[in-house]
């Protein structure tokens, strides 16, 4: 919700705002199968560590860009914002790997409850996030991005110091074929499922 206000100094048109908002989701959609495959091959911990570090980088770049004064008509800040959103979107592809960690450490009879709690946490984030961001923006419009960067950095410290490797070496798989990493091929398989098709 704060994106138009964060970008006000750049006077972007509606198309630029839409592309900037959608670039995160597109990057996440494209890389999620690859990140999942890499975690199956090399382990959960290194993949999550790299992705969380990427999130710190993407959010930090975004925060710096919207906080600095720029010459009018300059394209550089918009390019930096797109780079920041894409980096953060790629890093966001680790959500499936985080779910895999939960599956690795949870007994089958408690797995549904654990995933339910994760769903509740996501829901609370979507509800409380805009409210908290709005309150922080009253102090400074870029403050929510800086706070998010700080939380991402804290998350990275937690991952590096506390997250164990939950995917043992003898359970790891080789990388799949390129076709299996194609998100559009995966999406078509889902859509062709009779249960989904009826929806």
Can you say where each PLM-predicted feature lies in the sequence?
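C-terminal ends and interior cores of transmembrane alpha-helices
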Residues: 53-74
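Cytoplasmic helix-loop-helix junction between adjacent transmembrane helices
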Residues: 82-122
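Helix-loop-helix hairpin linking two adjacent transmembrane segments in secondary transporters
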Residues: 118-161
């Amino acid at each position: 919700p704060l994106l138009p206000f964060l970008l006000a100094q750049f006077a972007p048109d509606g198309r630029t705002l839409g592309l900037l908002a959608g670039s995160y989701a597109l990057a996440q959609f494209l890389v999620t199968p690859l990140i999942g495959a890499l975690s199956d091959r090399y382990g959960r911990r290194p993949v999550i560590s790299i992705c969380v570090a990427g999130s710190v980088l993407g959010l930090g770049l975004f925060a710096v860009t919207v906080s600095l004064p720029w010459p009018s008509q300059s394209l550089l800040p918009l390019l930096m914002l797109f780079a920041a959103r894409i980096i953060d979107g790629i890093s966001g592809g680790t959500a499936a790997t985080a779910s895999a960690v939960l599956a690795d450490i949870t007994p089958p009879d408690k797995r549904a409850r654990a995933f339910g709690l994760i769903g509740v946490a996501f829901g609370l984030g979507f509800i409380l996030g805009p409210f908290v961001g709005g309150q922080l923006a009253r102090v400074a419009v870029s403050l929510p991005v800086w706070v998010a960067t700080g939380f991402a950095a804290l998350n990275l410290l937690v991952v590096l110091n506390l997250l164990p490797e939950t995917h043992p070496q003898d359970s790891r798989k080789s990388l799949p074929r390129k076709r299996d990493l194609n998100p559009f091929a995966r999406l078509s398989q889902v859509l062709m499922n009779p249960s989904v098709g009826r929806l």
